[in-house]
């Protein structure tokens, strides 16, 4: 009860500190509209530069993507004797002149680097010094692009703008701290929408390189920022590395929010681990041992069962990691014929019970006479 109360308090606190990303709006500034209209088309992997002055306070570029992928922007920060390296702000507008992304590189480094996942299309990238002490200083910059069909698509900070996610795919995204920013378009959260089937077993995975992050998988009725875990369909909320049974067929949302730290790369996925019957490939006899090979399938792990009887009476069982497709059985009796089979399994939790096992059917049976 104390844990649930604590989680409730944290959720309320986060609801006050987490700024829910705003819907993107068309450029309402005539200056921005004119800048977009005159932005110069830039090529990837080409060096460019801009010298800041009272007349040049912003740098605008137009880029065109023929496919989905990750755009990387490298910029050298202007240096001031008093302030040191001056932070750079970056905004991205889509072809409809809507701002979809804002980020400030506030690292105490000479270079500013921003990575962002974008869909195919035309974009306008604007960056500028965070302070007005950069006159006469030059910023060198370059755009690069890596095609990636399994990446975030900004802006994806709400349910309505969530990046579509397929099960059993690792998605790449970038998240960074925007604490204190008043921009409506800051990268406050990344949201992915994935469709799951009731009764199937899944594992939610999130692997950040670094950073202080809230990463949850929510049902379609749960408020973002909720922390208390639940497997109920109306309150569904689980954290990374959770294996669960989907309580309904429909859309679920992977929600990622970073409230501290520099921009970092992460991987997120929802994998179907419902056990499926594996195929046993071979059983090779060794010296008082046998090496078993099978075809990998879905599941959190495998069980290899062996016996001196074809009906598997008095059988022994060994557990094997889901990453393996082979196992060595030791301490067998010489000149004896052993029968072997394998199955996959998944271990999951529910609202009422933990560590529930679900098994697939047993594979075909093979035998070998031990040396």
Label for each model-derived stretch:
Residues 299-318:
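Extracellular low-complexity, O-glycosylation-prone stalks/linkers
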Residues 332-350:
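Beta-strand-rich modules
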Residues 273-298, 351-371:
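Pro/Thr/Ser/Gly-rich low-complexity, intrinsically disordered linker/stalk tracts
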Residues 323-327:
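Short S/T/G- and acidic-enriched coil/turn segments that sit immediately N-terminal to beta-strands
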Residues 27-42, 61, 92-95, 122-166, ...:
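C-terminal edge strands of extracellular/lumenal beta-sandwich accessory domains
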Residues 2-24:
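Sec-dependent N-terminal signal peptides of Gram-positive bacterial secreted proteins and lipoproteins
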Residues 115-118, 196, 244-246, 329-333:
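Short, flexible loop/turn segments at beta-strand junctions in immunoglobulin-like
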Residues 23-70, 79-81, 106-108, 144-193, ...:
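Non-catalytic extracellular/lumenal accessory regions of secreted precursors
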């Amino acid at each position: 009860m104390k844990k649930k109360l604590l989680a409730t308090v944290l959720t309320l606190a986060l609801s006050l500190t987490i700024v829910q990303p705003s819907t993107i709006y068309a450029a309402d500034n005539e200056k921005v509209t004119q800048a977009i209209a005159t932005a110069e088309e830039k090529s990837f992997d080409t060096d460019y530069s801009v010298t800041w002055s009272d007349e040049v306070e912003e740098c605008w570029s137009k880029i065109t993507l023929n496919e989905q992928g990750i755009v990387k922007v490298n910029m050298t920060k202007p240096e001031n004797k008093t302030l040191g390296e001056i932070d750079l702000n970056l905004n991205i507008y889509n072809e409809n002149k809507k701002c979809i992304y804002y980020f400030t590189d506030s690292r105490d480094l000479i270079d500013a680097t921003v990575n962002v996942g974008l869909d195919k299309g035309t974009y306008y990238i604007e960056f500028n010094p965070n302070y007005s002490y950069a006159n006469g200083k030059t910023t060198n910059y370059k755009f690069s692009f890596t095609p990636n069909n399994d990446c975030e698509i900004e802006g994806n900070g709400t349910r309505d703008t969530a990046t579509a996610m397929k099960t059993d795919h690792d998605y790449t995204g970038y998240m960074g701290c925007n604490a204190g920013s008043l921009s409506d378009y800051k990268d406050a959260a990344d949201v992915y929408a994935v469709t799951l089937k009731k009764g199937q077993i899944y594992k939610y995975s999130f692997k950040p390189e670094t950073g202080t992050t809230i990463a949850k998988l929510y049902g379609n009725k749960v408020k973002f920022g909720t922390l208390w875990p639940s497997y109920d369909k109306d309150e569904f909320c689980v954290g990374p590395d959770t294996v669960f049974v989907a309580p309904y067929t429909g859309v679920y949302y992977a929600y990622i929010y970073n409230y501290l730290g520099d921009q970092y790369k992460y991987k997120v996925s929802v994998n179907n681990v419902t056990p499926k019957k594996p195929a046993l490939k071979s059983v090779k006899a060794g010296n008082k041992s046998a090496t078993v090979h099978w075809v990998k399938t879905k599941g959190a792990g495998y069980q290899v069962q062996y016996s001196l009887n074809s009906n598997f009476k008095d059988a022994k069982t060994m557990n094997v990691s889901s990453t393996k497709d082979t196992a060595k059985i030791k301490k067998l009796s010489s000149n004896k014929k052993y029968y072997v089979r394998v199955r996959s399994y998944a271990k999951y939790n529910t609202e009422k019970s933990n560590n529930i096992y679900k098994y697939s059917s047993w594979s075909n049976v093979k035998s070998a006479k031990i040396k």
